[in-house]
């Protein structure tokens, strides 16, 4: 029973990725954007290192 609960909770999509929530059908066109959104904070972290390297890590 717990295994069935996990399968429904994690809901593996066709591509094998874990989907924790699905957008309503009206917003299906935004799926590619929503997939990229969690990566944006990582870009800011990398930008901080690039910025510090450009000012010679003062």
Swiss-Prot record:
Entry's transmembrane regions: 29-49
Major location (coarse): plastid
Pfam families the UniProt entry points to: PsbK
Record-linked SUPFAM superfamilies: Photosystem II reaction center protein K, PsbK
GO cellular component: chloroplast thylakoid membrane; photosystem II reaction center
GO biological process, alphabetically ordered: photosynthesis
SS bonds (residue pairs): none
Keywords recorded for this protein, A-Z: Chloroplast, Membrane, Photosynthesis, Photosystem II, Plastid, Reaction center, Thylakoid, Transmembrane, Transmembrane helix
Localization per Swiss-Prot or TrEMBL: Plastid, Chloroplast thylakoid membrane
Propiece span(s): 1-21
Membrane protein topology class: Single-pass membrane protein
Entry keyword Signal: no
Database matches in InterPro entries: PSII_PsbK, PSII_PsbK_sf
Keyword NADP recorded: no
Family statement: Belongs to the PsbK family.
Protein purpose: One of the components of the core complex of photosystem II (PSII). PSII is a light-driven water:plastoquinone oxidoreductase that uses light energy to abstract electrons from H(2)O, generating O(2) and a proton gradient subsequently used for ATP formation. It consists of a core antenna complex that captures photons, and an electron transfer chain that converts photonic excitation into a charge separation.
Subunit structure: PSII is composed of 1 copy each of membrane proteins PsbA, PsbB, PsbC, PsbD, PsbE, PsbF, PsbH, PsbI, PsbJ, PsbK, PsbL, PsbM, PsbT, PsbX, PsbY, PsbZ, Psb30/Ycf12, at least 3 peripheral proteins of the oxygen-evolving complex and a large number of cofactors. It forms dimeric complexes.
Name the record gives this protein: Photosystem II reaction center protein K
